[in-house]
């Protein structure tokens, strides 16, 4: 189930870069913010407010019975019938969401070696979790194995709603941030993100259309990003050592 990545529109990439500036600026100021991947759900977003206009106009889930919805089910059933042991094992390894799913591409000891960058990723992850949960509740799309319990057999059980995938959107955001700091690793980072997203479909816990909202990383441009000294300091350090 290999699919090519969608190229980043240049204008959106510029907007995303400006938001990264504010990410690092605030992250360096506050190192105690909890991460949803380690300390439970956040009570509020970190950089965003959650009230940005884009969330109110975000495209909704595919309608039940629509062409996309029917195609989703057919893809899910086809993959379920053909998934091999390697694919199943990969899906099980990627089952639990963590920033490490992406940072391991750079270094398995990333948090220790690059603590300032890890702060940025952790705080961005708070926003990703908060906004993704909000959109999931609005759309209330049932998981494939919940919507079609007699047809879809998941590799493991998952709670909450299906659209959009938190694994796909969260790791996409992490990869886009890291690609700015480690440009030579961009292809490897994006391949890893696609692998994680595909594993969610292999596991039967997401439809394909749930895992392709590469929109999330671009929306951080909504946040003001005038204070950028800290990010500039971090982004210039890969030539020597990011710490």
Model features per residue range: what roles?
Residues 191-194, 198, 234-243:
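Short, conserved aromatic-histidine micro-motifs
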Residues 9-18:
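Bacterial N-terminal signal peptides
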Residues 167-171, 206-241:
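Alpha-helical transmembrane segments that form the membrane-embedded catalytic/substrate-binding core
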Residues 26-203, 224-227:
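Hydrophobic alpha-helical bundle signature of multipass membrane enzymes
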Residues 22-24:
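Boundary at the C-terminal end of the N-terminal hydrophobic targeting segment
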Residues 1-9:
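Bacterial N-terminal signal peptides that target proteins for export
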């Amino acid at each position: 189930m290999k699919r090519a990545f969608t190229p980043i529109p240049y204008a959106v990439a510029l907007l995303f870069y400006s938001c990264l500036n504010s990410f690092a600026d605030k992250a360096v100021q506050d190192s105690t913010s909890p991460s949803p991947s380690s300390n439970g759900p956040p009570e509020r977003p970190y950089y965003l407010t959650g009230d940005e206009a884009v969330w109110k106009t975000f495209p909704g889930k595919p309608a039940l019975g629509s062409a996309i919805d029917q195609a989703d089910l057919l893809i899910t059933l086809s993959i379920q019938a053909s998934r091999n042991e390697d694919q199943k094992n990969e899906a099980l390894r990627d089952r639990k969401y963590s920033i490490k799913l992406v940072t391991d591409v750079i270094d398995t000891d990333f948090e220790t070696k690059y603590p300032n960058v890890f702060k940025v990723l952790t705080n961005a992850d708070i926003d990703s979790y908060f906004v993704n949960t909000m959109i999931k509740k609005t759309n209330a799309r049932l998981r494939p194995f919940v919507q079609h319990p007699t047809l879809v057999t998941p590799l493991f059980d998952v709670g909450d709603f299906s659209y959009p995938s938190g694994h796909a959107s969260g790791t996409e955001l992490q990869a886009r941030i890291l690609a700015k700091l480690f440009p030579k690793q961009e292809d490897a980072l994006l391949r890893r993100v696609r692998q994680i997203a595909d594993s969610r479909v292999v596991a039967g816990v997401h439809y394909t259309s749930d895992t392709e909202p590469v929109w999330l990383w671009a929306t951080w441009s909504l946040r003001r990003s005038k204070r950028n000294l800290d990010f500039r300091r971090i982004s210039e350090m890969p030539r020597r050592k990011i710490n």
